[in-house]
């Protein structure tokens, strides 16, 4: 995607010539993936606010970071947190959340880190629950994202897991690596270890 989250995490250069030189070294790394049925994600899957942003942004003509920020502002003014039931490796949690991100790698893209300690090859997904927060704390939430300290926010809860079931009240968008889709109000996610080799 335009945020290059996975590429940035893997250290793949954004410069085309440098990226080609890296490819020509032919050094590969194995990474995990998250699976929802037959669909895979390699970076982050999300439900809630970020999925609503992805859904809206997909239909926007104004792209790039500025367009994305504009979409965030438009969505956040009307967005309401939802109630979720999560089953993470057999333990059940009930949460009212602003959004839930299931992270294979630490960042969305553009160096915004939602799960600072996530790893693409540890055989685990990090379930990041962003609780309802006062709007006046939004600047601090953004600071945490770009300072790699989201896990230190009192409004963020991170639970590692291999098998995850998320049930939400009503219908709401879901995204897999930024691509919006509708998979119903209950999704089952599991990690598949060492699923893909990437030349980086």
What are these model-predicted stretches?
Residues 2-6, 100, 128-130, 138:
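Hydrophobic alpha-helical segments that either span membranes
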Residues 88-89, 94, 119, 129-200:
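ATP/nucleoside-binding phosphotransfer catalytic cores, i.e., glycine-rich phosphate-binding loops
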Residues 34, 53, 100, 127, ...:
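A residue-level signal for conserved active-site and pocket-lining positions in enzyme catalytic cores
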Residues 1-98:
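Catalytic core of DAGKc-family lipid kinases
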Residues 46, 50, 101-115:
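Glycine-rich phosphate/pyrophosphate-binding beta-alpha loops
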Residues 59-67, 116-136:
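Gly/Ser/Thr-rich active-site loops/lids in small-molecule metabolic enzymes
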């Amino acid at each position: 995607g335009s945020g290059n989250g996975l590429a940035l995490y893997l250290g793949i250069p954004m410069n085309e010539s440098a990226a080609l030189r890296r490819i020509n070294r032919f050094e590969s790394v194995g990474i995990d993936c998250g699976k929802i049925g037959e669909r895979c994600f390699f970076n982050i899957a999300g439900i809630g606010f970020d999925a609503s942003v992805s859904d809206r942004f997909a239909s926007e003509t104004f792209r790039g970071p500025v367009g994305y920020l504009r979409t965030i502002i438009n969505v956040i003014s009307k967005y309401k947190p939802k109630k979720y039931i999560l089953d993470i490796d057999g333990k059940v949690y009930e949460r009212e959340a602003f959004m839930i991100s299931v992270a294979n790698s630490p960042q969305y893209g553009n160096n915004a880190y939602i799960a600072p300690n996530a790893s693409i090859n540890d055989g685990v997904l990090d379930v990041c629950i962003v609780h309802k927060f006062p709007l006046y704390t939004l600047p601090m939430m953004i600071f945490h994202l770009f300072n790699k300290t989201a896990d230190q926010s009192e409004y963020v809860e991170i639970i590692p897991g291999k098998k995850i079931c998320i049930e939400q009240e009503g219908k709401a968008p879901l995204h897999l690596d930024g691509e919006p889709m509708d998979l119903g109000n209950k999704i089952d996610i599991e990690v598949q270890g060492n699923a893909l080799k990437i030349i980086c």
